[in-house]
Structures are given as structure tokens and as C-alpha cells.
From Swiss-Prot:
Molecular-function GO terms, alphabetical: phosphatidylcholine binding; phosphatidylinositol binding; phosphatidylserine binding; sterol binding
Keyword presence, Signal: yes
Cellular-component GO terms for this entry: fungal-type vacuole lumen
Gene3D superfamilies membership: 2.60.40.770
Protein name as annotated: Phosphatidylglycerol/phosphatidylinositol transfer protein
Keyword list, A-Z: Lipid transport, Signal, Transport
Family designation: Belongs to the NPC2 family.
Top-level taxon in the UniProt lineage: Eukaryota
Leader sequence residues: 1-17
One of the protein's GO biological processes: intracellular sterol transport
Propiece span(s): 18-30
């Protein structure tokens, strides 16, 4: 739950989350890619995001790609166009392959407390750096995460999605065989 709290909190404030491509690092290269060094993508085209409360400028993940059992550092920056207050919520969906693991609506401000952030988030420029300890035991496979975030008046804050691939851990000397 700590990892999902980090995802929820970062998505709402200057909006970051994590996702993993095991094969390669990914950088922004089309209008849906979040700028920076992460495989995060916007859910909607730029024209559809113009009225969102949060404008995400950059998200950097270190290491990219993240690895099970490692500390993931998330650096995010953006602009909050209006304060985010109590009552904000996130619709969060996590799938493992085609299996839905999580499909919930969560209190954004309550979840942000788990990563030492609090509502209200004031209007203005915001930069965040957070460390997340990834568990060692992440089952290998493809994960898809979507977080669609709204304020208490149902005004859209942001929506991000990511595809996450975790591979099997191997013994290093066996890789050369």
C-alpha cells in the first residue's frame, strides 16, 4: 500500500508515479509521453489536458528502469493551477496482464499523508523528490497502472498511465550460458 500511496500522491501534486520497462529505459517521444526519463504516459491528448488542474513538466525515475528490491527515486515537477483540497480523489486501476488487481477510488489527501504530503496543495510551481523502496518479491509479468485524479468538485486534476514489466531474477553466471 505504501507504493500505491506514493503513486497516488505524486500523481496528484505534480503528478508522478512509477512504471517499469524491464528491457529499456524510456524517454518522452510523443504527445502522450510524460516529459523526462520515465515511461509514464498521459491518458489524454494535449488538447484534452489543457484544463487539467496540474500541468506536469517532467518526471525522472532513477534507476530507469527500476528493479525489484531497489530504491526508486521519483523526481517530478509541474504547475498546480488551483489548490487541491480535502475531498480530492483518485480512481486507481492496476492490472497484472489481463487480471484486474485493484479497481478503487481513494481519498487523495488521506493517501498523500502516507508519503509525507498534505492537503491543501497550494497553487503554483511544485517540485517533488520521493524515494520508494520496491519490494524484492514482485511477481514477474506485465502490470498496467492508471490513475485518474479529480478534485472535490469533480474537476479533472490529471490522468496518467504506465505499463510495468518485471522480469524473473536470474543468477548472473547463468546469463552467459
Amino acid at each position: 500500500m505504501r507504493l500505491s500511496a506514493a503513486v497516488i500522491a505524486l500523481l496528484s501534486t505534480s503528478a508522478a508515479a512509477f512504471s517499469v520497462y524491464r528491457e529499456n529505459s524510456v524517454s518522452a517521444n510523443d504527445e502522450l509521453d510524460v516529459p523526462g526519463k520515465s515511461p509514464l504516459r498521459f491518458c489524454d491528448a494535449a488538447a484534452d489536458r489543457k484544463d487539467d488542474i496540474v500541468t506536469i513538466e517532467e518526471v525522472i525515475l532513477t534507476p530507469n528502469p527500476p528493479e525489484a528490491g531497489q530504491t526508486l527515486t521519483i523526481e517530478a515537477s509541474g504547475i498546480v493551477k488551483e489548490a487541491i483540497e480535502e475531498g480530492a480523489y483518485v480512481n486507481l486501476q492496476v492490472k497484472y496482464g489481463y487480471i484486474r488487481l485493484i479497481n478503487t477510488s481513494a481519498d487523495l489527501c488521506k493517501e498523500m499523508k502516507n508519503v509525507e504530503l498534505e492537503c491543501p496543495i497550494k497553487k503554483g510551481r511544485l517540485s517533488i523528490t520521493k524515494n520508494v523502496e520496491l519490494p524484492k518479491e514482485i511477481p514477474p509479468g506485465k502490470y498496467t497502472v492508471e490513475a485518474d485524479v479529480y478534485n472535490s468538485d469533480d474537476k479533472h486534476i490529471t490522468c496518467l498511465t504506465a505499463t510495468v514489466f518485471f522480469g524473473r531474477k536470474t543468477l548472473g553466471f547463468l546469463d552467459d550460458l
